[in-house]
A protein has these predicted regions:
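N-terminal targeting signals for Sec/Tat export/insertion, comprising classic cleavable signal peptides
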Residues: 27-61
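Surface-exposed helix-capping loop/turn segments at secondary-structure junctions
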Residues: 56-62, 124-134, 174-180
Length: 195
């Protein structure tokens, strides 16, 4: 009985933690179509897809590789984390060092870090205007050589790449027999939770 109680408490705590992470659902639409609001909504869509694609992955899901020469789902999550870090750093015009200096070492830390990076980006982007967007740069430093790119490249680069790789996670987990939760509706940005 005591073991059952402990299991229930741990399960409840894990679910509470997951529900406290950003992008459990997409917020209501904004009243005006502005560049900032569109970017904000795009990141919400990316975050929502990632939230549900990466939720409740098991060891066999994380270890899965479609072929021996492919990277695993876990390695894909690491790559997605780096993409999210670059997205967040762009809002601050902060340098992205390559190779990446520090990546979270556990599945839960990767997942939370990725979602929090996207949330930080959205928190910052809401304070921007059209002129601010023109000043946002994606800055890379590789071995002391710095290169910067305009905000446009973030849209077809890291953001699009994150959507692509999130789709891989969805596909890989379906292959391992652990599909995403039923009720996830990426069109509405809401999830119908089953009881």
């Amino acid at each position: 009985m005591r073991l059952l109680q402990l299991f229930l408490i741990l399960s409840f705590n894990m679910n509470a933690q997951n529900n406290n992470l950003p992008f459990f659902e997409i917020s209501s639409e904004k009243n005006h179509y502005t560049s900032v609001n569109i970017i904000y909504r795009l990141i919400e869509g990316v975050g929502y897809r990632y939230y549900w694609a990466s939720k409740d992955l098991k060891k066999e899901d994380l270890d899965y590789k479609p072929s021996s020469s492919s990277i695993s789902s876990y390695e894909t999550l690491e790559h997605i984390y780096v993409l999210s870090e670059t997205i967040m750093n762009s809002a601050l015009n902060k340098v992205n060092n390559r190779p990446t200096e520090k990546t979270p070492k556990s599945y839960n830390e990767l997942r939370e870090g990725t979602l929090m990076n996207l949330q930080k980006f959205n928190d910052i982007i809401l304070s921007k205007n059209e002129d601010d967007l023109k000043r946002i740069k994606i800055i890379f430093n590789r071995g002391g050589r710095e290169a910067s790119f305009p905000f446009w490249n973030l849209l077809n680069g890291q953001i699009a790449d994150m959507i692509y790789h999130t789709g891989q996670i969805v596909s890989f987990r379906r292959t391992t027999g652990n599909p995403i939760q039923k009720g996830v509706n990426v069109f509405l940005g809401k999830t119908k939770l089953s009881n």
